[in-house]
Amino acid sequence: MVVQVGINGFGRIGRIVLRATESNKDVQVVAINDPFIPLDYMVYMLKYDTVHGRFDGSVEAKDGKLVVNGHAIAVSAERDPTSIPWGSAGADYVVESTGVFTTTEAASAHLKGGAKKVIISAPSADAPMFVCGVNLEAYKSEYKVISNASCTTNCLAPLAKVINDNFGIADGLMTTVHATTATQKTVDGPSHKDWRGGRAAAANIIPSSTGAAKAVGKVIPALNGKLTGMAFRVPTPDVSVVDLTVNLSKGASYDEIKQAIKKASETTMKGVLGYTSDAVVSSDFVGEVCSSVFDAAAGIQLTPTFVKLIAWYDNEYGYSNRVVDLLVHAAKVDGAL
């Protein structure tokens, strides 16, 4: 069996989700909706990518459809999610990647068009949130709308889980040094809710808020209220890095901490949490499929209970692969695979 998938919003995440499905035998994209990108432009945007390079396959427009590696994908341009013909295209699972319909009520509009389940590729205020490697066991088939949380939560939560399970986290602060995203400005412009966020992305390091650390408490209840954090937006096109500084409940040497993370990366969190001791920099992680790669050589320890841990993530590619993994997990639990 193959899960038939629809994508609403053909932006950074939507396009990379499609790329990720091309190497996953359990998933096939059958429909894409985007009111702002006509078919010929979809071909161009999928084929060429400044960060991730040219698409490794064939892409063309034919008979009003997007044809990827010989497979025809229905295309629509509806602004109202209730009007998207998911049912007629056979799309049972829909990836909601516009960044607009992020609540259960808003995302549920896709169900009216024939979708059976919606995966939001963003944090949600009220939809159940899941992070691969952390809390997938909490998923229930009765959920019609679920969230894959944020790219930063996907990086932070696996690392936090390993540390908390082995040593306990009394409390901690996170900083993500985050690559530029599409919502930022190329030159100074109006941004009424976030004045700093309106400054030129390529010319500034911009302090910003993030709910990623607090969201860890939603997927790891034992850490609820124990973590918070902030972001610095920096002038790089992709790949971000988490700096997690924690007070441990149980003292440990840095070697013991590294060993616990390495063990998890090779067993329970293989494919989600990576491990490296090389002298790496951000560009080394473009195209990284893990949610989080622990940088063993970059962390520092002050006392046995006070430590700074560093983890890299491709905020586009790794996250998009987890969207697909979450979808596949849901489909298996639902009996669709």
Swiss-Prot record:
Enzyme nomenclature, EC number: 1.2.1.12
Induction: Highly expressed under anaerobic growth conditions in the presence of glucose and the expression is highly regulated in response to carbon source and/or anaerobiosis.
Keywords: Cytoplasm, Glycolysis, NAD, Oxidoreductase
Location relative to the cell: Cytoplasm
Tree of life domain: Eukaryota
Catalytic function, reaction form: D-glyceraldehyde 3-phosphate + phosphate + NAD(+) = (2R)-3-phospho-glyceroyl phosphate + NADH + H(+)
Residues forming the catalytic site: 151 (nucleophile)
Matches recorded under PROSITE patterns: GAPDH (PS00071)
Cross-referenced InterPro entries: GlycerAld/Erythrose_P_DH (IPR020831), GlycerAld_3-P_DH_AS (IPR020830), GlycerAld_3-P_DH_cat (IPR020829), GlycerAld_3-P_DH_NAD(P)-bd (IPR020828), Glyceraldehyde-3-P_DH_1 (IPR006424), NAD(P)-bd_dom_sf (IPR036291)
GO molecular function ontology, one term from the record: NADP binding
Pathway assignment: Carbohydrate degradation; glycolysis; pyruvate from D-glyceraldehyde 3-phosphate: step 1/5
One Gene Ontology term, aspect cellular component: cytosol
Positions that bind D-glyceraldehyde 3-phosphate: 150-152, 181, 210-211, 233
Pfam (any one): Gp_dh_C
Residues that hold NAD(+) according to the record: 12-13, 34, 79, 315
Assembly mode: Homotetramer.
Family, as annotated: Belongs to the glyceraldehyde-3-phosphate dehydrogenase family.
Name of the featured protein: Glyceraldehyde-3-phosphate dehydrogenase 1
Organism: Mucor circinelloides f. lusitanicus (Mucor racemosus var. lusitanicus)
